């Protein structure tokens, strides 16, 4: 007999993958799984999957050689957040273009997007609530 444990509000998932586009699929899979366990709709799950992929695509060009992408996923019973981060090339600022199409996609698919450019670390924090924006 098996018992499925529901994800609770204090559960977080942290992972690190090489800063390579081939590994963004791992981040997409994790966010989709967490959203499904929180009973997000299929459309909301797809929105999160695409948003995490876009966040990774925005960050990868700023990653230093041999860098890794770190991701922390968590939230509450009715929302999810994902923080995706890279270490930028030393001496290079990690400025992201907030007028780009990728940024537009991020803001359209999530409820909030926060950019943190602290030192040599560049991160995006995405948040999406279940049932938000008329879903």
Language-model segments: which ranges?
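Bergerat-fold GHKL ATPase/HATPase_c domain
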Residues: 1-47, 94
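Conserved ATP-binding N-box helix of the HATPase_c
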Residues: 42-65
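Small/flexible residues
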Residues: 30, 39-40, 51, 70, ...
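Conserved beta-strand-loop-beta-strand hairpin that lines the nucleotide-binding pocket
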Residues: 1-14, 58-135
